[in-house]
């Protein structure tokens, strides 16, 4: 039997870096990636036969857990009728109708009137800004520092010395970067200045509904609503990236969860801490992007929003978008099965599991005297090695990130698979039972001690890898 190390060495002979997405290489934590052979429920097993409780969950899609029988049956039954047609199917229509009806808040607002399926989250975000530019007749886009919207050129931009960004990846031209303006997250003052500095030039603001790629950093109370108000007052569209949060933090995603608070008690907070019920208003983004849960574990993406904007897409409008496997029957079958099974009991269970784990993590670090904060949105959460919870990218990357490697490998050796970067979110599923929770909890004391004993390294920027 070949080991994980041997397979990784072999992979590097044929695959750049040995992986097909950078974070999988364990560059941020060191060591050898685990090559997985099978998965069931809350557990994955590597090629050496070691079983792990899985807190990666394929980076979020698997809210029901791995290999849910009804999802598997849906995919197999569909595959028997054909893997792909390159033609319309009824499954596409059913999925679009389900999404348009499910993205709904407590006030009954349904902002997704049309849905276009693509194959990835990157495609969905790329298409959304193309739509925004056509609809507004403007070129500039605004993104927040630390937010991830895929690997299309307009998004691989870091904050420069001013507000105009510069490429964060090789191969991205400066001519592209000049059209992306990067501003600090949770900072309305800079955003307000931006609209003064670039009047009638900004097509859209694209924002992760709740950032989950620099750790989980919920928006300040009312921030999303004020961003929407500000953008709309200047004629810019608001694009809500719910690639991670969509159908994960609740059946209607983060937008529905947050705006529903306006009609609930003040204590019904989306994240840690209390908020006033006036902090949230029923703001409505113009466009949404989805992926992950929408495909039930298979490749998919989607753009949804107001009909007058969405109808600009070809063939009904001038904005070109196409894809050979867009709306493919296997992904739509898996997505439909997943979303139809994801009732309130599923989300309530995931929330209970997440809350139990968060409490245990906080207690373990507190008892050991190791600085750590945990932030969450629904069942989505992440840790930060800092005494104060980060509010933006600068604070997130100023944490004692070097402690995570020791923590990660201790948990791994105890049979718990975590994201191999401190900047990634942790994902539970409805398949988590008492046994899975117990294994995670039992692994924490040793892992926290390992983190606490990590040799100090100079604080500095260690960029997230995706």
UniProtKB/Swiss-Prot annotation:
Classification via CDD domains: OAT_like (cd00610)
Q: Has UniProt tagged this entry with the keyword Chloroplast? A: no
Give the matching Gene3D superfamilies.
Aspartate Aminotransferase, domain 1, Type I PLP-dependent aspartate aminotransferase-like (Major domain)
Alphabetically ordered keywords of this record? Cytoplasm, Isomerase, Porphyrin biosynthesis, Pyridoxal phosphate
- Pathway(s) per entry: Porphyrin-containing compound metabolism; protoporphyrin-IX biosynthesis; 5-aminolevulinate from L-glutamyl-tRNA(Glu): step 2/2
Question: Where is the PTM N6-(pyridoxal phosphate)lysine found along the chain?
Answer: 292
Any one Gene Ontology BP term: protoporphyrinogen IX biosynthetic process
Principal localisation: cytoplasm
Instruction: List, alphabetically, the PANTHER family matched.
Output: GLUTAMATE-1-SEMIALDEHYDE 2,1-AMINOMUTASE, GLUTAMATE-1-SEMIALDEHYDE 2,1-AMINOMUTASE 1, CHLOROPLASTIC-RELATED
Protein name as annotated = Glutamate-1-semialdehyde 2,1-aminomutase
* Species: Tropheryma whipplei (strain Twist)
